[in-house]
Amino acid sequence: MSDSQENKPVETPTEVKPVAEKKPAAEKKEKKPAVKKVGVMETLQTPDYVKERIEIWESLKAKHLESLKDMKEEPINVTLPDGKVVAGIKNKTTPYDIAKGISRGLADSIVSSKVNGEQIWDISRPLEADCNLQLCKFDSEEGKKTFWHSSAHILGQAMERIYGGQLCIGPATSEGFYYDMAMGDKIVSAEDYKLINEVAQKIVQEKQPFERLAVPRDIALTMFKFNKYKTEIISKIPQEDTVSLYRCGTLVDLCRGPHVPNTSYIKSFAVTKNSSAYWLGKAENDDLQRVYGISFPDKKQMEEYENFMREAALRDHRNVGKAQELFFFHPYSPGSAFFLPHGTRIYNKLVEFIREEYHRRGFTEVISPSIFSQKLWEQSGHWQKYSENMFVLPVDKDNFSLKPMNCPGHCLMFGSRQRSYRELPLRFADFGVLHRNELAGALTGLTRVRKFQQDDAHIFCTTEMIEDEINSCLGFMQYVYGIFGFEFGLELSTRPDNFLGEIAQWDIAEASLEKALNKFGKPWKLNPKDGAFYGPKIDIHITDCLKRSHQCATIQLDFQLPIRFDLEYQSDDAAELKKRPVIIHRAILGSVERMMAILIEHTGGKWPLWVSPRQAIVVTVNKTHNEYGQKVCKEISDAGFYCDIDDSDKTISKKVREAQLAQYNYILVVGQEEINGNTVNVRTRDNVVRGSLTVNDLISEFKQLVKEFK
């Protein structure tokens, strides 16, 4: 719930809490009956509760329209991003009207708006006061969120018509939208997609308007008395607050909005997949059916999306990981990857790379325990806020937990003896194994796991050192991401309303971060009030070759842990001999597992030589060349590179083809000619024939490529 002030409608979120996804429904509940196929929309039955819900809505809408008749027209001023001020009328002029006054083309291209830089607003909803107004097209973050949220309502209406179950939540996501429904023993299957799409398309063609009302809590409870999931959400709203509802066609839903003006804006709609889920993400709660979808303002974008998804499927790290024998998962240890020899090579290389940079950049590597008493987590504050995500074990009549993060342990290390200002900045780095109790349904390959390692570091420094340390962190991050070929964006998140600490300290810290970002010289965005309660932060989003955004690196200031652990250092200030340090939380790879998944998909499994688990393979023409081939393989291996040999009886063309499919960087063919010249015939996985090279020259080339991270 966002806005709970008296006399203001509660902007009820469509998604109250993430709902854990489980196995695909068709796999988990094969024996349960699928929905009866009805073929066309006209044969579908409208549930009785829908009729009652609409009757209540129409009554409330009539009262609302009647109340507007007595409302006096009051002028308002609407300020656009370019500074232009447009006159409007309170509770009458809409963002669409403002856009239409500029040009009809602009009006037809926007799907959402933002009022006063914060609240996303329907373009068909009248403005209520003087404001700053930003008009948002589909390609903006606000535009996509609004567009896909509206599409979720279309999906929800279609599911009500087809299945007649109880809708739960239906949010927009970063990749489209979904809706959950309680359906008893019924399940959704891939065979249903065609019918869902047909019904959704009919809803689009009907050009159903999205209408909004703010109603008293008691009326909302009456309207949704048939749906225990909606009433559970409503019951959490304070009695004196109003509830925001939206209607399109036969669907009335709890929703904070905003939405597009009508369903015809959704030009292209498709169901993409389905699964089962738990209500409120808890395994002890009811089973739900989840249907995912995607939509766009035109069919061309849908075609581009489908092409993108085909390419993404080819690069999916789970498929590549299996094909290249890098890792696997087992139900005996959900969310914990088994890294096979070739996957371990990549994993270790990433860690070694960061470790070498630590040595160059003044970080001190430490090793901390994996299990701590509950008392530590109570002192750090994590027990109160994070215990449900921790693995807790009873030990010696006390509760212990596997650590989900390293920072409290590093605080104990800093506080283990008296510290001097001469030791600062003190940079602790830790590759310790972390465990977080993620919901089973949320586990996804290497990107969402329970056991992982981070390139985690905590910098203990003075307030005066913040700017230089942040600059150093940004430079470190830029160097690493440059090697991987990632573009990145920066965002500064400042003091939230629930901040802890002194405002003066926050002001100094935020100014230091801003100076560091400006000095760094890359564009950055401001996210007001989006920092953590314990300090401001810089969020870094990388972009892969498919233009997908991932957040891996974090740079976070922390004023609270030094207070909680009573950390001090001996200062050189005679007026204040003891001072508290500031902590900078810093990671670049983030989770090594997640970064490995991103790199697999970024490279498509075609690893650059420096990090490749299969750098070279010697391929013999026939068995008479095997002895020389083994000699070459050993020389390359002894030089520190991964080299295999295929001295089987297969044909040379088949050996080469299999080596290319296995993504060996270099394929070294040896026959009698190579034996005579003490050389190898070099070709690449992309079938580029390089010709003959001596083994020493080849090893020198390998060393240079590794040195250049190629």
UniProtKB/Swiss-Prot annotation:
Catalytic reactions of this protein: tRNA(Thr) + L-threonine + ATP = L-threonyl-tRNA(Thr) + AMP + diphosphate + H(+)
PANTHER family linked: THREONINE--TRNA LIGASE, THREONINE-TRNA LIGASE
Gene Ontology annotations for the cellular component aspect, listed alphabetically: cytoplasm; mitochondrion; phagocytic vesicle
Residue numbers spanned by region Disordered: 1-35
EC number: 6.1.1.3
NCBIfam families membership: thrS (TIGR00418)
Gene name for this UniProt entry: thrS1
Keywords (A to Z) from UniProt: Aminoacyl-tRNA synthetase, ATP-binding, Cytoplasm, Ligase, Nucleotide-binding, Protein biosynthesis
Protein name: Probable threonine--tRNA ligase 1, cytoplasmic
UniProt GO BP: threonyl-tRNA aminoacylation
